[in-house]
Amino acid sequence: MTTVSHELDDVIHEIACVELGDDKMAFKSDPIMARFKETGTELWVDTGDLQKAKSIWKTEFTALTTNNTLANQVVQTGVVDEVIGQTVSRLKEVAPGLSEEELVTEIGFVINCRIALRLVHSFKTGVSVELHPSMSRNIERTLNYARRYYRVCPEYFTIKIPLTPEGYLAVRTLRKE
């Protein structure tokens, strides 16, 4: 599948999005991290695991970064089992013609969004989300999924695009937008 229909895209967007509350948590400062930050360094935490991030987060941290491997680790904990079940049911209802590969891709998109949105909700900071490597050689798919991630949370999501010739072309197009 190179693109998702606008109708299906709207349904997936609805499934992927969750309301963000205003309950930012308070975190402690770390003097060593403060010294790093004073040098102009931006400190990012590399995890999709909300509890792990909460246990190490300091006020000096700038953002969080996730990727497909980290998202898979979260999936293995069972935290998103309900989301997966609801997503499968809803997609089979509205798009019964999706192939297994298309269904898995869309479920992955929803899971990545939900994991990243949980982090945004808790930390009220930027979170990078990564396009799946299977899209790395297809400009149209790269553009489509990058736009879809951006649509979910433009204020907080940074979209990581695979470093391929097609990725460079996609970035050039997206920067113009």
Model-derived regions: residue spans:
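Active-site beta->alpha loop and helix N-cap motifs at the rims of alpha/beta catalytic domains
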Residues: 60-61, 68-171
